[in-house]
Amino acid sequence: MIIDVQHASWRRDQTMIINDISWQVQSGEHWCLLGLNGSGKTTLLNMINGYIWPTTGSINVLGEQFGSVDLREHRKKIGWVSTSMQQRLHGHEKAEKIVLSGKFASIGIYDQIEEQDHAQALSIMKQLDAERLVGRTYDTLSQGERQRILIARALMASPELLILDEPCTGLDIFSRDQLLHRVQSIATQEHAPTLLYVTHHIEEIMPCFNKTLLIRDGAVFGAGDTEAMVESNQLSSFFDTAVEVRSEPGQRYSIRLV
């Protein structure tokens, strides 16, 4: 099992942010986490990464029970792309150095870099059409280029789990589509990591995401096969608004109010 969350809750002061969530992710599954802003999606991810601890309940990730594992070493098995990660990076750092730092799950490089590490970083950047960014500093990159570098960084340690927390935020429509197709490519390659993709836009749910978790008000509204979760009746109840969902086999979803 990749992730096993059992009755996890998390409270900030007197406010319940995550409320009694139980959720399992099996090997071979790729999940989309769908919910409106403030629904608790990112908080749940922070618990899965070990950055915050559940007030009650338990979390097991990649076979390790949190509370009995070296989290710094454990995070090397988890690739993470998020706005908060982007804000922690140093703008003067060169793109390839940021990618290399992913091997150590660190901000900056404090370990010995081998020639094979450089070769791997360049190979991953090429896979993501980012090799032309070598030598560029992070603060000179566009938002789309920054996201590609963050994904390359996340892949550097060959993670077993890749978490993409609203990676299309701030992207124009063309950059968004390019990024989504790269995500699809990553998910369908041999020995791909398990993907968790967080969004509140159903048109970002690529065909590779065979499972969907619906989160509302910090609780699980529904979880299961994407075709069952992302359909008109289910999402009308989820959003508390009448909507029509359309899709074709192997294509992305669209939604409209009715």
Regions from the PLM with identified roles:
Residues 3, 17-20:
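Conserved structural motif at the start of ABC-family nucleotide-binding domains
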Residues 49:
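Helix-to-loop junction immediately C-terminal to a conserved catalytic motif
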Residues 57-67, 74:
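Conserved ABC transporter NBD signature motif
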Residues 100, 115-133:
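Conserved ABC ATPase "signature" region
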Residues 137-141:
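Conserved ABC ATPase signature
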Residues 162-166:
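Catalytic Walker B motif of ABC-type/P-loop ATPase nucleotide-binding domains
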Residues 212-225:
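H-loop (His-switch) and adjacent beta-strand-loop-beta switch element
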